[in-house]
Amino acid sequence: METPTYTSRMSKACVFCSIVSGAEPASIVVREDGLTAFLDARPVFKGHVLVVPDMHADDLAALPAAGIAPLFLLARRVAAAIEHGLAAQGAFVAVNNKISQSVPHLHVHVVPRTKGDGLRGFFWPRTKYGSDDERESYARRIADALAAG
């Protein structure tokens, strides 16, 4: 199993590290406490913001525990600012962890939403468990992995 990466240095190959350092241009909305939030270059909707830790973390597992609350507190503030500043009716807040993560630097998407905007909940089809036993088996396997640390 690959070990997640968290470094106190910025990665020269990482576009988000380049944005944080100022080497790559971006529309920054806020920089504070080791975090940077900027407009997504390929937004779902105009005003789509990415919130990133300044230090390189490949994914959520790589971010030290002390960094989790500040990251999501800023994402919450950005969501509120999007509602007030852009007259959005809400926000979609999400993290892709490895799969569908287009840039291997942890980032929280904060996407403005309005009723009837065409975005229909999640981007993937829903499924069902074949039985209560199968559902409980999944719950047990996850609980066991959590207990194992």
What does each model-found stretch correspond to?
Residues 1-149:
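HIT superfamily nucleotide-processing domains
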